[in-house]
Structures are given as C-alpha cells and as structure tokens.
C-alpha cells in the first residue's frame, strides 16, 4: 500500500546498510521497512544517512532511536517499522 500511495516505481533487493548508503549518496529516494529488523542491522547505515542529512523515522514521525532497554529478550533490540529518506524530503504523506 505504501509503495502504491507514494508512486514508487523501482524496488531494489539489497541489504539494509546498502539501502541507507544509497539514500545518503542520493541514488535512492526512500527506504520503507515494514518487517522486523534489529538495531545491529540498521544502526551503522542509519548513522551514515543522518550524517549526510537524511532521516529515519517511525510510522508516527518520531525519529528512530537506538539502545532501547526495558523489554524482554531480543525485543530490546528490535526496530519498529520505519521509513528513511535522503536529504530534507518529507515522505510520510501520500503523493
């Protein structure tokens, strides 16, 4: 649904860190993630993206945070669904 609502025309199947790097480099526009990932899958790539001026937010628009604690087992390190983009674009609103 997100892809259709935002006129996404091409999808690339590569690892999370590479997706963040493509966003940071300006070679991709958006990285929506609606399935489970862990902090160690995304933290380094997200840091590169943010250093390049991009953003990663949860579906309610809150910046994605790392180092969460206080829940059971591996859930401490599970990411919520998120959307990342390069530059200062706003992508939570449909096109």
Curated annotation (Swiss-Prot):
InterPro entries reported for this sequence: CysQ/Inositol_MonoPase, Inositol_monophosphatase-like, Inositol_monophosphatase_CS
Top-level taxon in the UniProt lineage: Bacteria
Keyword hit for Transmembrane helix: no
Classification via Pfam families: Inositol_P
PROSITE patterns linked to this entry: IMP_2
SUPFAM superfamilies according to UniProt: Carbohydrate phosphatase (SSF56655)
Presence of keyword Mitochondrion: no
Entry keywords, A to Z: Exopolysaccharide synthesis, Nodulation
GO MF annotation, one: 3'(2'),5'-bisphosphate nucleotidase activity
GO BP, sorted A to Z: 3'-phosphoadenosine 5'-phosphosulfate metabolic process; phosphatidylinositol phosphate biosynthetic process; polysaccharide biosynthetic process; sulfate assimilation
Record-stated family: Belongs to the inositol monophosphatase superfamily.
Protein name (record): Uncharacterized protein in pss 5'region
Species this chain originates from: Rhizobium leguminosarum bv. phaseoli
């Amino acid at each position: 649904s997100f892809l259709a609502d935002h006129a996404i025309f091409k999808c690339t199947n590569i690892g999370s860190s590479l997706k963040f790097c493509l966003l940071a480099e300006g070679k991709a526009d958006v990285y929506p993630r609606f399935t489970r990932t862990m902090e160690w899958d995304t933290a380094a790539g997200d840091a590169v993206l943010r250093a390049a001026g991009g953003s990663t937010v949860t579906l309610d628009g809150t910046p994605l945070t790392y180092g969460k604690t206080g829940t059971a087992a591996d859930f401490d390190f599970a990411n919520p669904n998120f959307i990342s983009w390069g530059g200062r674009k706003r992508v939570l609103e449909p096109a």
